[in-house]
């Protein structure tokens, strides 16, 4: 009714200031879904930015999948609305881009479960939200979830930056990924390579 309409008006005016914040929010959902690997891919051209986040978490049933892009649906008990996916969908679509989510629930697909989110943004549109500080988002994810693996790839034209925590883990052995020195190394390396 009236309350829902007012909340929707509030929701549509409060998009995230950077796509990198959406990345952080959605990747956090992957970790909460029990993912051991979350892949984050940003592919840019002069005209478009394509964001793909896929995980091997527990996935969602078809019923839950239909509901997750509704800002009034959430699995959280601490608030009555879930903003991450609905905001990403809205932000992509308001640039004339697209949004797609697919998922396979572990209960139905015990061998190949997980969720994939794909959003395409038109960078030339007036409502385009900039990518922002994606390095900080990736470092924050690793700091908060040192036992989860992340594969981050950012491609712009013919240049590409990749960070695979599985490779770091193999080299570092017992050193935790969220130790200060490792996080500093990751951040400095990504910042240097992100100058594309």
Which residue ranges define each predicted feature?
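Acidic ATP/Mg2+-coordinating residue in the GHKL
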Residues: 55
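Flexible, glycine-/charge-rich segments associated with ATP-binding catalytic modules
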Residues: 1-17, 90-196
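Short beta-strand-loop-beta element adjacent to the nucleotide/active-site pocket used for signaling
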Residues: 43-51
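Conserved ATP-binding N-box helix of the HATPase_c
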Residues: 16-42, 91
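Short conserved segment of the HATPase_c
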Residues: 60-71
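Glycine-rich ATP-lid/hinge loop adjacent to the conserved G-boxes
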Residues: 73-81
């Amino acid at each position: 009714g009236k309350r829902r309409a007012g909340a929707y008006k509030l929701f549509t005016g409060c998009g995230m200031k950077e796509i990198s914040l959406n990345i952080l929010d959605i990747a956090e959902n992957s970790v909460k879904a029990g993912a051991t690997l979350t892949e984050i891919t940003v592919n840019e051209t002069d005209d478009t930015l394509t964001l793909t986040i896929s995980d091997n978490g527990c996935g969602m049933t078809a019923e839950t999948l239909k509901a997750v892009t509704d800002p009034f649906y959430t699995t959280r008990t601490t608030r009555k609305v879930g903003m991450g996916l609905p905001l990403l969908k809205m932000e992509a679509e308001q640039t004339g881009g697209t949004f797609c989510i697919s998922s396979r629930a572990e209960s139905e697909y015990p061998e190949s479960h997980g969720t994939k989110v794909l959003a395409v943004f038109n960078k030339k549109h007036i409502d385009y939200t900039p990518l922002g500080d994606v390095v900080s988002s990736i470092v924050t994810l690793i700091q908060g979830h040192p036992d989860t693996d992340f594969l981050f790839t950012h491609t712009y034209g013919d240049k590409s930056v990749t960070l695979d925590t599985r490779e770091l883990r193999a080299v570092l052995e017992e050193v935790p990924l969220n130790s200060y020195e490792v996080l500093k190394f990751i951040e400095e390396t990504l910042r240097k390579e992100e100058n594309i």
